[in-house]
A protein has these predicted regions:
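Short helix-perturbing small/polar motifs within transmembrane alpha-helices
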Residues: 1-2, 17, 24, 83-136
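Hydrophobic alpha-helical transmembrane segments
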Residues: 12-17, 32-48, 59-64, 67-75, 102-122, ...
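Interfacial aromatic-anchored transmembrane helix boundaries in multi-pass membrane proteins
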Residues: 26-38, 66-100
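Helix-loop junctions at the membrane-solvent interface of multi-pass transporters
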Residues: 28, 52, 78-79, 107, ...
């Protein structure tokens, strides 16, 4: 992002492409199950977005995805749409995605501006994924408590089964981000 002129055409295109990637992966059914936990691809894109785009562009991409869903396009999980999703049982996760994009994107920007050794880049990006996951789970747990009226213990229990797979998705997002940022270093936030 140019500090003098705001968003450039490239920034807008990247925001739109990453919002579209998240939307497309939302409607693809889980590719397999691990016990009762589905392995859906959408969370990989959610974690990849701030790693590659940074805080502002990453937050805008997640925000655009949410806006498109709120305005009625069926881009939320299971083909859902509308403002009701934001205040439904899983709405907190969407809020967590937005928070995570800004916070993890800021961490990614700091990490990438320090120009870590290529061999260490995936490790640093995994740290970014962990920051993102903390924000997502924080939003999701608070959303379950507020919108589904679950207790803290019940909300934590509802999420525990997903943590392992989300860590695997974080590793995949790190590997993809490393490849993208190595091939296109000018994308770095």
């Amino acid at each position: 992002i140019s500090s003098r002129r705001g968003f450039q055409a490239t920034d807008l295109a990247l925001v739109a492409v990453f919002a579209a990637l998240i939307a497309v992966l939302a409607v693809i059914p889980p590719i397999f199950m691990v016990g009762a936990v589905p392995f859906a691809l959408q969370m990989i894109a959610v974690m990849l977005t701030p790693m590659v785009l940074g805080s502002v562009r990453g937050g805008c991409a997640i925000g655009l995805y949410i806006l498109v869903g709120v305005l009625g396009l069926p881009v939320f999980s299971g083909g859902a749409s509308g403002v009701g999703v934001l205040v439904g049982p899983t709405g907190g996760f969407l809020w967590g995605w937005l928070l995570g994009a800004f916070v993890a994107g800021a961490v990614a920007t700091v990490v990438l501006r320090r120009r870590p050794r290529k061999s260490m880049l995936p490790v640093w990006l995994f740290l970014v994924a962990l920051v993102d996951l903390v924000c997502v789970y924080l939003g999701g747990i608070l959303g379950l408590m507020a919108f589904a009226k679950l207790s803290l213990n019940a909300a934590l229990a509802a999420n525990i089964a997903f943590v392992g797979l989300d860590l695997v998705k974080g590793i995949l997002a790190c590997l993809i981000a490393t490849a993208v940022l190595t091939a296109f270093p000018r994308l770095m936030p």
